[in-house]
Amino acid sequence: YLQSQERYESQKEICQVAKEYRRRGTGLDGIVLDWCSWEDGMWGQKSFDHSRFPDPSNMIQTLHDEDVHFMISIWPNMDPKCENHKEMKEKNLLLPFSDIYNARTEQARKCYWEQAKRGLYQYGVDAWWCDSSEPFTPEWSHTERVEPALQYEEYKRTAGDYLGEEHTNDFALYHARAIYEGQRSEEKG
């Protein structure tokens, strides 16, 4: 069983949830730290907010001691205040007119992985949830439910404006590839 909720607020909360599953004898294979693992206002930064997750290595080891794997959500978009964003921008690795890295280029994928490695993987992260892999999602701003066919057309048009219509479905593949190839390169050594 993989446990996830909208998000966990702290290292303490995650460890308590895993411990409670074990106390009850309920199966738990992994726990997901969804959005906001980063510092407040740093959306998409690939690092832990050390005020809420003061010792990520210890947190993950505590989970491993309970035979629980740790998965974290990572995002392709980064707030301009983030160090990750600044690095991507300085290296010209963002998609034009956006805060989303250009996963279709090898250099951007390698940079993205290095950021994930530095800020997250080094602590023992087991798995990745590549969130928002359809990075241009106009439905987030809707106030009313839109009929699915119209919503799909709106997505195609919006994503096509940024990626080119022929590439609206391949971003997720390249985004996942950044993590897959990056992590595999670490495990070969």
Where in this protein do the model-derived segments appear?
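Catalytic-domain carbohydrate-binding cleft regions of carbohydrate-active enzymes
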Residues: 1-189
